[in-house]
């Protein structure tokens, strides 16, 4: 999911990119778009049977380098946190593999020090059934906003994608939430089912593209 505090960061919706097995962010109202550099990107892409999800344009870095035989960690060692001091927004990323194992990462500054880079990687080769892990950009509000700390948080996964997505969407701050994407993967067949929640309607978009039949779109 993505959140927004400024008008520019709230001016977004998730739009499916079926030819790449993922989604992109687009401006809900292009006339109000101020700076696209850190808010327009591909949050989700699929490389073969590997699913990549991040909070920035490092999605493409991971996709490109993994397609060349590099690893998730190799790709992220070429990147750093976002250049938006004094917050220096962390880059958070994850990959889910064909067998259901997954890896996560956060790239962040050292307590807001823009001259010091910290990279953390978390590997889950044998996930526990019914359990997931959560990592976010920030720990809580502040000035500057402190980055997430520690290991990813564990949570219990609901049995259906609908329960999971609806529960998560309803729990997000109603003023700041922008969009949510959820995906369920059949580990036997590799087939996927996706849901997209967008708080705002796009002024001009193809969100109802009939070719994107595997996507369920909801407004809230």
Regions found by a protein language model. Name each.
Residues 1-34, 157-214:
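Extreme N-terminus nucleophile/cap motif
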Residues 1-3, 51-60, 95, 103-107, ...:
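Short hydrophobic-aromatic micro-motifs
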Residues 216-220:
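Conserved small/polar residues in nucleotide/adenosyl-binding loops
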Residues 41, 48-50, 89-92, 102, ...:
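Short, surface-exposed beta-edge/turn micro-motifs
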Residues 47, 110-165:
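C-terminal, well-structured catalytic/ligand-binding subdomain of enzymes
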Residues 1-2, 42-44, 90-97, 104-105, ...:
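Short beta-strand scaffold segments in enzyme catalytic cores
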Residues 58-116:
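Short histidine
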Residues 26-29, 33, 44-74, 79, ...:
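Alpha/propeptide regions of enzymes that mature by internal proteolysis
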């Amino acid at each position: 999911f993505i959140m927004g505090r400024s008008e520019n960061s709230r001016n977004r919706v998730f739009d499916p990119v079926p030819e790449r097995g993922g989604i992109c962010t687009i401006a809900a109202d292009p006339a109000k778009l101020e700076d696209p550099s850190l808010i327009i990107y591909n949050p989700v892409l699929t490389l073969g049977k590997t699913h990549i999800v991040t909070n920035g344009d490092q999605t493409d870095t991971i996709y490109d380098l993994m397609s060349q035989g590099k690893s998730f960690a190799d790709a992220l060692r070429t990147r750093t946190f976002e250049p938006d001091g004094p917050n220096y927004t962390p880059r958070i990323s994850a990959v889910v593999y064909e067998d259901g194992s997954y890896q996560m990462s956060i790239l962040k500054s050292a307590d807001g020090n823009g001259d010091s880079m910290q990279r953390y990687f978390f590997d889950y080769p044998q996930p526990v059934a019914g359990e997931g892990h959560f990592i976010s950009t920030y720990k809580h509000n502040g000035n500057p906003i402190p980055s997430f700390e520690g290991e990813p948080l564990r949570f219990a996964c609901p049995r259906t994608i609908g329960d999971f997505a609806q529960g998560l969407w309803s729990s997000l701050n109603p003023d700041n939430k922008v969009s949510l994407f959820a995906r369920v993967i059949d580990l036997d067949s590799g087939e996927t089912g996706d849901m997209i929640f967008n708080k705002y309607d796009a002024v001009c978009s193809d969100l109802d593209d009939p070719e994107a039949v595997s996507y369920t779109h909801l407004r809230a």
